[in-house]
Amino acid sequence: MSEAAMRLSACIEWLFAAEADNFADRIRLAHAHGAEAVEFWKWTNKDIGSIEWALTETGIELSSFVAEPMIALTDRANKDAFLKGLKGSVEMARRLGAHTLIAQAGDDLPGKSREEQKAALIETLTAAGEILEGSGVRLGLEPLNTLIDHVGYFLHSTVEGIEIVKATSRPEIGIVYDVYHSAVMGEDTAEVIGGNIDRVFHIHIADHPGRNEPGSGDIDLRRRVDWLAEHGYGGAIGLEYRPLAASAATIAETRRMLG
């Protein structure tokens, strides 16, 4: 991937956490050390005023954060609560300049068939697309690995994730493709994404084993990221890993490895 096209998004839940307690200072550090963007998970537990000021002060992009509430979308009973919360998340995304929200599917529910849960997901995401229409904000559903980090999670297949978001027929609904989770599940990027790069709204990377910085494990991250870029992905690369080295050094090394 050419350095000119590379935009690295530091997940400040983990990056710069050892260097700064508050998220505003982590934003400043990410900017100072060359990241083009930042991202985080939940927004309702953060000092949004200080984060907004740090984003304005540095000019760094906020690439994404998690849509709240984080409840099981596999349960139709949660639909109204999620959609109500989504409206607040969209307002916050527009305030902070983020164009992508991340959705978690939730756990595989006992007593409910997989098809029933999938139908609930599609129904809720379709309604979410209607809320997002015209807002400039999109929602990415994230498949996660169920072998190490998220045992019991419903959506562990990228192919199934793409099937679900395509079933909504909503252009505002896509996936977040996490290369680490995909690799843990034994997936090949080219095989599982195929001709659906338009449905990939955001990507995350980390190495395996350990979920640490690129170069610490065995995943051929450059090959996978290059394939995504060559097939049309032009968004930020989310650095969602637990750094073993200093965060600033891992950003520089990731840029070198991917470039």
Predicted regions and their residues:
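Histidine-acidic metal/acid-base catalytic patches
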Residues: M1-G34, G97-H99, E123, L155-Y177, ...
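Active-site-proximal loop/turn and secondary-structure-junction residues that shape catalytic pockets
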Residues: W14-F16, K42-T44, E68-I71, D107-L109, ...
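N-terminal substrate-binding region of glycoside hydrolase catalytic domains
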Residues: I27-T44, V66-I71
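Conserved beta-strand positions in the central sheet of alpha/beta enzyme cores
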Residues: E39, S64-V66, I102, G140, ...
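Glycine-rich, proline-tolerant flexible connector loops at the mouths of alpha/beta enzymes
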Residues: E39-E57, A105, K112-S113, I148-D149, ...
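Catalytic-core regions built around general acid/base machinery
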Residues: S50-T58, A127-L132, G195, R223-W227
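Short hydrophobic interaction/assembly module
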Residues: E52-D80
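Active-site acidic/histidine proton-transfer and metal-coordination neighborhood
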Residues: E57, R76-G174, V184
